[in-house]
Curated annotation (Swiss-Prot):
Belongs to the ATPase epsilon chain family. F-type ATPases have 2 components, CF(1) - the catalytic core - and CF(0) - the membrane proton channel. CF(1) has five subunits: alpha(3), beta(3), gamma(1), delta(1), epsilon(1). CF(0) has three main subunits: a, b and c. Transmembrane segments: none annotated. HAMAP family: ATP_synth_epsil_bac. Produces ATP from ADP in the presence of a proton gradient across the membrane. This is ATP synthase epsilon chain, chloroplastic. GO terms for molecular function: ATP binding; proton-transporting ATP synthase activity, rotational mechanism. It is found in: Plastid, Chloroplast thylakoid membrane. SUPFAM superfamilies: Epsilon subunit of F1F0-ATP synthase N-terminal domain (SSF51344). It comes from Oryza sativa subsp. japonica. It is a peripheral membrane protein.
Length: 137
């Protein structure tokens, strides 16, 4: 069996394909979705989206929050923004992480600290996405 996965943002369609399974970051933690999953509507948290293709290859994307609906082997993810892991430059992601870490330690005031921590979280997620090692089949 397979799942139909659609990942949409206001700017573009990120994904429209049949897959075997996904691992999705939600506000209550990560969930794995296999065929015949119980219907669910859930908020999507900032985090990685792991996609297992029909050929058992794994791909990674990064979601920047949104909403997901899973019903009848169809997964529709409406995201505020998203990136495919293959579009993320590993060196650039690592540099952004180092800059974000420095900005947190230099932040002055609550607003600046909150913004720096959000940027740090985003940078960590991007680095995690490009460094993820998929499970062996």
């Amino acid at each position: 069996m397979k799942l139909n996965l659609y990942v949409l943002t206001p700017k573009r369609i990120i994904w429209d394909c049949e897959v075997k399974e996904i691992i999705l970051s939600t506000n209550s933690g990560q969930i794995g979705v296999l065929p015949n999953h119980a219907p669910i509507n859930t908020a999507v948290d900032m985090g990685p989206l792991r996609i297992r293709l029909l050929n058992d290859q794994w791909l990674t994307a990064v979601l920047w929050s949104g909403f997901a609906r899973i019903v009848n082997n169809e997964i529709i993810i409406l995201g505020n923004d998203a990136e495919l892991g293959s579009d993320i430059d590993p060196e650039e992601a690592q540099q952004a992480l180092e800059i974000a870490e420095a900005n947190v330690s230099r932040a002055e005031g609550t607003k600046e600290l909150v913004e720096a921590k959000v940027a740090l979280r985003r940078a960590r997620i991007r680095v995690e996405a490009v460094n993820w090692i998929p499970p062996s089949n």
